[in-house]
């Protein structure tokens, strides 16, 4: 009887020591080139926080407001801290190539999300194809008869030179250049008030020649209504297409200020990126990318409006 009791107690002790080890929380890093004041990034961040809550793992998050050096330092700090996995955007084409090599050499999974960089050897990418998005936006304006040869298109962006805008412009140029449609990219910054001020100033000075607008980022596209109202532009007077990952833009589409918005599943993008990092940390290599995105107009904008409002 005593021997049997010892066996039972020993088995219980083994079980108690094994269970915590199996359920031990991991530490991941979620690193963004964006800024906390940008409404769309609150949704990307929400996805990361939800993942942490659902899995019980720790997710250290940071925003770098377009500061490439700061983001590079953050990724290297995560490597030095022996993170279980890293998820990061690409702040500038080629800027993380060497750092990704460092992560891979340290056997730390590093997943790229939101802004792709094919030059860097990430374990996987989760997000949209920005070149294709840009091409679709330009083609949308052409196919709908909203721009033609000789027209001028204004393309505001938060951070000129950042990966997302550079790739989107590449796609846009492939459509517009052969058709003789010209455009200008202008800086709007990541500060909401400054975005509106700069956009109002530009449109006030150039309203007569602007035949269409492509918002290369969520903050600029989500500011269209406020800019139009201040300048005296009526909804639909100037065609607009661009990013649509915020309630500001879904409402602009529903009310006719923006013709079409690009959805990228911001919450799901972060959630899936962290899931892939976790999977890789457990020894299962992803071996694939996850591409998101859908262009919506007024007839389907309510779907995305409800998602973003949590309904």
Region locations from a protein language model:
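Hydrophobic alpha-helical segments within soluble ligand-binding/sensing domains
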Residues: 71, 126-152, 194-196, 245-249, ...
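Flexible loop/hinge segments that line or gate small-molecule binding clefts
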Residues: 93-132, 246-254, 258-259, 300-308
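Hydrophobic alpha-helical
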Residues: 76, 84-105, 172, 184, ...
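Hinge/cleft segment of the Venus flytrap/periplasmic-binding protein
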Residues: 26, 156, 164, 174-176, ...
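Short beta-strand elements in bilobed, periplasmic/extracellular small-molecule ligand-binding domains
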Residues: 53-65, 151-156, 175-193
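Extracytoplasmic "Venus flytrap"
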Residues: 27-51, 55, 59-76, 83, ...
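Short beta-strand elements at the ligand-binding edges of bilobed clamshell
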Residues: 61-63, 117-142, 185, 255-267
């Amino acid at each position: 009887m005593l021997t049997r009791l010892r066996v039972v107690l020993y088995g219980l002790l083994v079980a108690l020591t094994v269970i915590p080890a199996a359920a031990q929380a991991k530490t991941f890093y979620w690193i963004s080139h964006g800024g906390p004041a940008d409404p769309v990034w609150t949704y990307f961040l929400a996805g990361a926080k939800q993942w942490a809550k659902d899995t019980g793992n720790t997710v250290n998050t940071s925003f770098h407001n377009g500061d490439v050096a700061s983001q590079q330092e953050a990724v290297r700090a995560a490597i030095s801290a022996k993170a279980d996995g890293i998820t990061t955007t690409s702040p500038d084409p080629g800027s993380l190539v060497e750092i990704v090599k460092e992560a891979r050499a340290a056997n730390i999974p590093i997943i790229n999300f939101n802004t792709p960089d094919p030059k860097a050897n990430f374990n996987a990418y989760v997000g949209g194809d920005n070149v294709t998005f840009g091409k679709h936006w330009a083609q949308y304006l052409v196919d709908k008869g909203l721009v033609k040869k000789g027209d001028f298109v204004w393309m505001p962006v938060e951070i000129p030179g950042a990966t997302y805008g550079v790739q989107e412009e590449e796609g846009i140029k492939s459509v517009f250049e052969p058709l003789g449609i010209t455009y200008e990219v202008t800086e709007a910054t990541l500060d909401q008030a400054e975005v509106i001020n700069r956009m109002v100033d530009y449109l006030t000075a150039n309203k007569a020649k602007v035949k269409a607008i492509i918002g290369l980022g969520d903050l600029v596209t989500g500011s269209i209504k406020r800019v139009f109202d201040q300048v005296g532009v009526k909804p639909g007077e100037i065609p607009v297409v661009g990013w649509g990952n915020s309630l500001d833009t879904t409402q602009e589409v529903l009310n006719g200020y923006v013709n079409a918005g690009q959805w990228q599943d911001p919450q799901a993008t972060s959630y899936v990126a962290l899931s892939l990092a976790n999977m890789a940390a457990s020894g299962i290599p992803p071996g694939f990318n996850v591409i998101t995105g859908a262009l919506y107009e007024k007839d389907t904008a309510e779907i995305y409006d409800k998602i973003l409002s949590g309904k």
